Amino acid sequence: MQKKGANISLKGYDDIFSTEQSRAEAQQERVQEIPLSELHPFEGHPFRVVDDEEMMKTAESVRDFGVLTPAIVRPDPDGGYEIVSGHRRHRASELAGKETMPAIVRDLDDDAAIILMVDANLQRESILPSERAFAYNMKLHAIKHQGQRTDTRFTGPIVIAQ
């Protein structure tokens, strides 16, 4: 009869001697300066980024003050980062001659990234109705794909049947 070895799993030194606080800090999202060359647009991004007068004002602001609100990006398996929220800030940074841009890196699956991207962009006022409709359609498909609703708020009109 062959003797089986014990299946022992030992934690590393850092796991044993780190504090709850240091482990929590390691899990927190941080703003990072990411080179613009490592950032690329979200595949299927339904909103146009146009070099219009408003974009030139944004680029001037970025040149003078930097990007005030970090973009949200996710790691791309092929390298670099995919922009989930911040396409206009990215373009303004390019026009302003910047080399890096502040961003928060999040691990998001496709559905979560689509929902976040749509929600972040629908807050803007200058969206074409066709872009808005396409974005809502993307969000609907992402929510259906997840198999559940991601929020409990109802934002439509309330109709009471009698």
Give, region by region, the residue ranges found by the protein language model.
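Alpha-helical interaction elements
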Residues: 123-162
